Design a protein with these regions (language model features):
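Walker B catalytic acidic pair
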Residues: 295, 301-303, 313
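Peripheral, non-AAA+ core regions of ATP-driven protein-machinery
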Residues: 1-214, 218-225, 261, 326, ...
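The Walker A (P-loop) glycine that initiates the GxxxxGKT/S ATP-binding motif of P-loop NTPases
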Residues: 217, 280, 302
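Walker A/P-loop
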Residues: 215-255, 320
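Basic, amphipathic alpha-helical bundle interface domains used for macromolecular binding and assembly
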Residues: 35-46, 61, 68-78, 284-285, ...
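Catalytic P-loop NTPase motifs of RecA-like helicase/translocase cores
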Residues: 113, 300, 306-307, 350
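P-loop NTPase nucleotide-binding/switch module
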Residues: 168-205, 209, 237-290
Length: 506
């Protein structure tokens, strides 16, 4: 027949809409026309496909060829369409008999020799194909990442000839081999941090409830050390979470996917990171740091050194767990549910009080003014990490609690949360907070009066309740008590610091 249809998938973030490759061969002047909003890289496929077909032992049709990539309103880029275009050409020119062609989808770039090359984002394309009941053929370069998907619906090929022989029933394509296991537990241990017991307690609460944490203190007190130990307190990703994170990572670094399997992402962008690098962007938007940190941790060291507009762009994703990127050519949603951990010095000189302070209150407030109030309001806990008192360093950290011990308490608290409300504390909405974070009447009145004195917002009220509920779970208490609220209020260092500076200015 002179018409052939082959199925493949486009690349729009982590979504993979179906693309139908239609090839029609008719009499007329020899030539190839490609329609359906193809980008330059797709238009270049005509030369790659021509050479691949000839070097695979077939002939390129010397007729009028029309190739349509439908639907036409979706932008299409990259070399992922080479393989389906080549197969459609061979079927339409009656060089390939493939009666079961519509049971498969194909993605892959072709070398001039006909060899298959991998493409970015194969995981999400394979998952979408499997959902509609079709098997998908990918290149050997993508074997490891699609091997993370359970089942035998993904088939691996190394050359155009192998795919053609498979469709004719002369060759069997195998699914990915080898079982991927979670990476080794080689996280840094919290016991390496000398002193800072309140900081370790805050880290335990953050790990149990999925809360956001701001660490403040002079240089060299252990803020970054504490933050880097958080992944060692968290459970590994579930299979569903791991696939979500792997699908995002495969868009930018496919070779790193299997090494990160079931490990919580830990992203630490430099303060010079641009808005595009942080949230994602491009003419067809690529994922940014907040999406690469999905289901994991985003650590921002030297927080005030980031551009203010970059930090304020995080406000919506922190609340919604996703980022919407709207560009002229494409509008894409990326998941971005992460824990935000930040560290900062309290002043431009590193200290804001005591004998080491070299900054005036005006200079310190100007420095903190780089952080907007709504952004600071997104932190559930803020804690000062002070210089260690005399005698702590000389003891050399003897008797410090290890991460393995703390992890047991964290896992138990998370299990209690999931059994009660089927989600982490940090993900509760306002309606669920009323149900799961109830207070006694006198405690509610006391908390409201306290927040009024501190000038805190309704969002701060809700975050305090969630932190107090996590503390109660860690203590194995059924209800939120006054001492849980008091401990939650003790983790509001940024509010106390701002009030102190404003008092000095008065």
């Amino acid at each position: 027949m002179s018409l052939a249809i082959v199925y493949t998938r486009a690349a729009l973030g982590v979504s993979a809409p179906l693309i139908t490759v239609e090839v029609h061969i008719s009499n007329g002047l020899p030539g190839l026309t490609m329609v359906g909003l193809p980008e330059t890289t797709v238009k270049e496929a005509r030369d790659r496909v021509r050479s691949a077909i000839i070097n695979s032992g077939y002939s390129f049709p010397a007729k009028k060829i029309t190739i349509n990539l439908a639907p036409a309103d979706l932008p299409k880029e990259g070399g992922r369409y080479d393989l389906p275009i080549a197969l459609a050409l061979l079927v339409a020119s009656q060089q390939l008999a493939a009666p079961k062609l519509n049971q498969y989808e194909f993605i892959g770039e072709l070398a001039l020799t006909g060899a298959l090359r991998g493409v970015p984002g194969a995981i999400s394309r394979a998952m979408e194909a499997i959902k509609v009941g079709r098997q998908i053929v990918v290149a050997g370069d993508n074997a490891e990442e699609v091997g993370l998907i359970n089942g035998n619906e993904c088939l691996i090929a190394g050359h155009l000839q192998e795919v053609c022989a498979f469709l004719e029933g002369k060759h069997i394509l195998q699914p990915p081999t080898g079982e991927i296991t979670a990476g080794e537990d080689d996280y840094d241990d919290l016991g390496d941090v000398i002193g800072q017991q309140q900081g370790k307690r805050a880290l335990e609460i953050v790990a149990a409830g999925g809360h956001n944490l701001l660490l403040m203190g002079p240089p060299g007190t252990g803020k970054t050390m504490l933050a880097s130990r958080l992944p060692g307190l968290l459970p590994p990703l579930s299979n569903q979470e791991a696939l979500e994170s792997a699908a995002i990572l495969s868009l930018v670094n496919a070779h790193y996917v299997t090494r990160q399997w079931r490990r919580r992402p830990f992203r630490a962008p430099h303060p010079s990171a641009s808005l595009t690098a942080m949230v994602g962007g491009g003419s067809i938007p690529a994922p940014g740091e907040i999406s690469l940190a999905h289901n994991g941790i985003l650590f921002l060291d030297e927080l005030p050194e980031f551009e203010r507009r970059v930090l304020d762009a995080l406000r919506e994703p922190i609340e919604s767990g996703k980022i919407h990127l709207s560009r002229t050519r494409a509008k894409i949603d990326y998941p971005a549910r992460f824990q935000l951990i930040a560290a900062m010095n309290p002043s431009p000189t590193g200290h804001y009080q005591g004998q080491h302070n070299r900054a005036t209150p005006e200079q310190t407030l100007r420095y903190l003014g780089r952080l907007s109030g709504p952004f600071l309001d997104r932190f559930d806990l803020s804690l000062e990490i002070p210089l260690p008192p005399p005698g702590v360093l000389s003891r050399g950290g003897v008797g410090e609690e290890r991460s393995a011990t703390i992890r047991l308490r964290v896992f138990a608290a998370r299990d209690r949360q999931l059994a009660r409300q089927n989600k982490r504390k940090a993900q509760l909405d306002s309606g669920e907070i009323k149900v799961w974070c109830k207070l006694k009447e006198d405690d509610a009145i006391w908390l409201e009066q306290t927040l009024s004195l501190l000038g805190l917002s309704i969002r701060a009220w809700q975050r305090l309740l969630k932190v107090a509920r996590t503390i109660a779970d860690l203590n194995e208490d059924r209800d939120i008590e006054r001492h849980h609220l008091q401990e939650a209020l003790s983790y509001r260092a940024i509010d106390r610091m701002l009030n102190h500076l404003q008092t000095l200015m008065a």
